[in-house]
């Protein structure tokens, strides 16, 4: 016992010793061990203070009733807290704050009745919470919101009857939940718990227990098995809805909302789609019946209100209502602004927009360009102002603007709808079959949003990485120099973020096989009148196409020529005109080969079938032609024009008598042969237009010469004299002769048009295609009027975004400098003198345009539009220039073919004399009345009534007189003529000021030369680049030099079809604008009222309004479906009670009149692909509707007329031309430039300084200098500019400085006399060097004086009469001395030998060495010596050796040896 007592005592002692060490941290009577504090059964009434490092705190079995705030402060390390078996009644908010690491909390077997909302806030690590065996009746919905890691929650054996939805919704880590042994009422409000328990059960991650206590029928049922049908739950339904309210400041607003449902719905109010919080604003009250009461209303209360009724079975909303607040007027402000929104195709989208203001603003929507929304049932505006679009498509993408408008102001906000779409192919690649070495393009384009990226693969694999495979920015795959291994399938993929699409095409590569001739032609000689077949065939892969050329001009299918499928050329009725060199050309995509032969035609001396009828026929032809011409003259000039046909004939009637006589002679010649044909036909009883008749058998060559003499053809041949080189080296002739000294008639006026291809006539000579109803390639040719109405005419006009109407006007003005076809002088048929417009038959010279049945524009049952054929050239149609053979009909160009300002000066001496002011001797052109601006108009034409006086009700003012007879055709053209006539007089006046010693002729010709150069520069440097674009300018090429082998003559195809493309640029209205570029009071002029109306210039403001209209208004864009406006096709030269003409139909008919080959032949000439079907045209005419129209009209692509086909070709990018038209125009303009000896860039035409100044000129400068009062223009008159920003003052437009034309000479007394050009001026009265029209001497005398010196001088000062005797003596002495000198010169000239400076004589052609370095030669009395040039020496001391010209390096040679 003693030992035991000692042990106890020791233990007690140790305890006593240890306790003092822990007394400052361990609560009294508690047991503390390390971090565990146990205070059980101590009757504690509050939580004691414990050490901060405590991890386990056991407070069980005490009498704790309340948990004080901060009771567990600083216990951040606490892991387990045991508070069970106490007397706690309430868990206050944030009772366990700072216990962030607490995992286990025991609160069971207390007396807990309530738990505040945020009681467990801060317990982020809590995993287990035990609250069972308490007296809890309700739980706040946020009680367990802050327990993310809670896995176990025990609430069984409490008094819980209802649970608020969402009570456990935040417990994401829950694994076990116990709610059993509660008095749960299983009604509709507990369905949320049933759903939660089912989720726990299905997932298997958590266990839960909850049973129903009430109603009795469900007692003991697991809550998870309860269904809504068992509880009779009902979704809310609205029984009373709110209405819009208008309120003023301070009033009270009531919004009524009543709803029924099971359980009773909760009423929630929304404002502008946001829930209203009644607690945040004491003015807001929710009454028991759901009514929203707003007291003391303020401006901020206005907006969109909506009531929502909600219970566990669902929710429902009322319609939106508006509270409008009316206080002080206030500008609108946006409550909700639209936002950029992305949407997929096919889905719906809403752009929200609402606004407030006083009064309440009205909300409207537009597209971004302020255009109204389309009327589309898919598009609606919501009651709140939002824009709602259903089933969105790609067109809905773009900018939308919301406008909020009240009486104070309008505000707007913009947003974009971005429609995202899966890529869709717009262009898919086509299978290609090409030859190796060629380049192939696979076109592939797609659309989508975002814009898809194009990628290419071959056979599913990446393309070869080499420079031959290129993917262009457009998506096109280009393979250069195709090789055999490139063959295969190529896939195009279009990819964007929404999706991708793929398509494929095959490439087949063929080996190259160039054409090889299988049959070659040989030279042939045949008799006149026989049919000839020239063999030629070729092989190759692909099969070559055979074409034939005669003397460099391509042969086309016609009544004269036929090319068989094998390539054989058949020539019908061979004549002398057919002999020459023929070339057979075999062409395929790989290359071409050619072979040629010579055809000779013999003319036997035998009589012909028509010889007996020559005499009577020529007499009858002269009588009938003269009768018809005189009848036409009387009809046209003795009265006012009665019809559009009269008007057309009158303004195109030649003014030059020589032209009239030449045309008359040609008509008589052709009429004579026609009469002979008629006589022969009546005897043979055969159809002369048939294939069985041979024209070369008609008349013998000697009779053809007789007909030529009697008709006047031989009489009116021009004999050109180009011997006056003092003139021809410096200036042009008016008629264009002697420009090309090797070929004086090339490019001259009144000569035949040139041709690229042989003419096509039905009979091979003069009968137009389609005139006899013949079938071509299985189809008849359509009526030209039908072509116009079906294909060409348009009411719709698309403005050109780049170029002004001046682009058209310069083209017309230029055309009138290049070509004008001489038409028949008679408007009546030769056979009986009846008017062509009345009889409507194709009897010479009538060629009417027949009107289809039911044409909408025909009046008075008219059957045709009047038209006569172009006059033939003497020597064509029936005869050659030798007058002994039959040649195809050719037409006559009345103008020079050069750009020489002939539209200003005329194309003949007769015309130039009419418009020159010869009386003033100042080199001016005649001028008319002077306007208020101080600037003159053109002079009026004199003579009989003109086309400008067709309507006496408008004005009696006659036509203006200018260099071209068409100057009055329309007001814009007349304005251009006025500009350039003033430009001539302006330059001439300045040149006279600079060179007062020049005479009138010199000033005139120098000015004419400058004006022509200005027009050349404007055309090629400013105008053509707009028409041709970069592609065409490269085809045209740079100017190199004058080429005398280039014929600058105008091509028939150019004048008759190609250059008429300008008709597609014409607007239907001529605009007239004032200084502010606003319409003038008299208004604009419809085009059909602008024809032949000079009175509008005289009486209605001059030329300035018209010029501003040309530079200030866009031209008409050439669109394949919008070609010629109806002012040209329906109202051309319209007059009352008459059928107006149709320009498009005239163009088609004129092409057939001139024998222009079909479009297909020009495709071959221009190296485009041949076509067999209309789909073969798809590369040049992409519009399928246009191709279908062509098919309906022509039946075969081989029949299409040239003019309409050129007009419907798609434009080459950057140009205003299609590919064939580009080919024809570049060919013509290259010839015009390169074949002109006086081209302004040709060295020697102008000095370098003068050329520099000419290149300063511009149409803008001409407009500034010569308009009535134009002060502002754009730099480039051809480009569209916005007024006034795109315009500049005329002061800023570069000028041409004429001072470089000033003579700098010591003795200017005779310099500048027209007869003293350059250093070879002549005396004023020197006949041998006079200008042609001043020279009265016979040409024979002129020819004898060609070697006479051009320089003669007059005495400087004549002596006074008193000194006359001395003067005579001096003159006699001078004459005697001159005679001696002349005799010496004559003796020297008569001797062809030479005498050198030493006096030694040498015979002609003798050569001798004057010294070692000089060799001389005698030739025709002149000695010419040549001095040898020595190379540089490479030694320090070169040596000269006698007899050797050049020094040698002797030292070097010695050293080297």
Swiss-Prot record:
Annotated LRRCT domain residues: 182-234
Entry cofactors: Ca(2+); heme b
Annotated protein name in UniProt: Peroxidasin
Catalyzed reaction equations: L-lysyl-[collagen] + L-methionyl-[collagen] + H2O2 = [collagen]-L-lysyl-N-S-L-methionyl-[collagen] + 2 H2O + H(+); bromide + H2O2 = hypobromite + H2O; L-lysyl-[collagen] + L-methionyl-[collagen] + hypobromite = [collagen]-L-lysyl-N-S-L-methionyl-[collagen] + bromide + H2O + H(+); L-tyrosyl-[protein] + bromide + H2O2 + H(+) = 3-bromo-L-tyrosyl-[protein] + 2 H2O
Any one of the GO BP annotations: hydrogen peroxide catabolic process
Keyword Endoplasmic reticulum carried by entry: yes
Stretches of the chain forming a coiled coil according to its record: none
Pfam families referenced in this protein's UniProt entry, alphabetically: An_peroxidase, I-set, LRR_1, LRR_8, LRRCT, VWC
